[in-house]
């Protein structure tokens, strides 16, 4: 019965994580149409790519037995994120931005290659699992921290304009699914990052219900029009900066995340 329940939550996590990975599609369609990345940042997609690669590697049978569902979603996520990165490279706003993306991509490839080579050539058995699990967990937690910027923005503006309900719900459900999957499999490298993702998703939902009636940036009391306008403009800039990171949430398995248009996607382990 426990195996069936674990399989169920693993499949559920795969489905929800896929939604999170695909959430920035609208943004990338805009980039393709305008043939420019404009002010969008490609950093979150490079980080999510690394997260997915490490998590997919961790889930392979010779690294971590009985975690193949972790590999399936993160393998899929790796392909999706790689496509996003390629689009950024093609439509980079200028040569400097393109070189920056290439630099980040080279770092991603170097880190992943190092983890793979060390785990294959120097480690075996449980030592290999622990090493790869730690690497994946560290970057999963970093990805789950992405929503913090959006939550700060919501509290500052008292508006949920930049934090869509469905995306926040997906982040919570994704993190929760993989958290339970990890509990049933007694795997701390899945439990820890996705526990963080589930908690942050819950906080997002709480903030949404607190400020759900405010659909536009609020004007802080006691501020003049100029100051209020500055706050609104600042809010827009912050939203644009974080725009591509929330995805979460998608985990090591994709429970860990993606941010598109002010949203986050996590990646799951």
From Swiss-Prot:
Pfam families: MtN3_slv. Residues 28-42, 94-100, 151-164, 211-269 are cytoplasmic. It is found in: Cell membrane. It comes from the Eukaryota. GO terms for molecular function: sugar transmembrane transporter activity. Its main location: membrane. Residues 1-6, 64-72, 122-129, 186-189 are extracellular. The keyword tRNA-binding does not apply. Disulfide bonds: none annotated. Residues 8-96, 132-215 form the MtN3/slv domain. One of its GO terms (cellular component) is membrane. It is a multi-pass membrane protein. The chain crosses the membrane at residues 7-27, 43-63, 73-93, 101-121, 130-150, 165-185, 190-210. GO terms for biological process: carbohydrate transport. Forms homooligomers and/or heterooligomers. Belongs to the SWEET sugar transporter family. Mediates both low-affinity uptake and efflux of sugar across the plasma membrane. This is Bidirectional sugar transporter SWEET1a. It comes from Sorghum bicolor. The gene is SWEET1A.
């Amino acid at each position: 019965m426990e195996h069936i329940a674990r399989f169920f939550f693993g499949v559920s996590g795969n489905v929800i994580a896929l939604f999170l990975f695909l959430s920035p599609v609208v943004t990338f369609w805009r980039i393709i149409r305008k043939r420019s990345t404009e002010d969008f940042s490609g950093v979150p997609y490079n980080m999510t790519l690394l997260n997915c690669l490490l998590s997919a590697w961790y889930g392979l049978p010779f690294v971590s037995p009985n975690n193949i569902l972790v590999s399936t979603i993160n393998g899929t996520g790796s392909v999706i994120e790689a496509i996003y990165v390629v689009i950024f490279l093609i439509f980079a706003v200028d040569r400097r931005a393109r070189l920056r993306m290439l630099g980040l991509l080279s770092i991603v490839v170097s880190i992943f290659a190092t983890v793979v080579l060390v785990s294959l050539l120097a480690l075996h058995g449980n030592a290999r699992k622990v090493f790869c699990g730690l690497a994946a967990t560290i970057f999963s937690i970093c990805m789950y921290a992405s929503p913090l910027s959006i939550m700060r923005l919501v509290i500052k503006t008292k508006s949920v304009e930049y934090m869509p309900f469905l995306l926040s719900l997906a982040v919570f459900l994704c993190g929760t699914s993989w958290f339970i999957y990890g509990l049933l499999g007694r795997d701390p490298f899945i439990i820890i990052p996705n526990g963080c993702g589930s908690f942050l998703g819950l906080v997002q939902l709480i903030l949404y219900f607190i400020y759900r009636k405010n659909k536009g940036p609020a004007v802080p009391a006691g501020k003049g029009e100029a100051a209020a306008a500055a706050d609104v403009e600042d809010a827009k800039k912050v939203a644009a900066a974080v725009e591509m990171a929330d995805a979460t949430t998608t985990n090591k398995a994709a429970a860990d995340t993606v941010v598109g248009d002010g949203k986050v996607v996590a990646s799951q382990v």
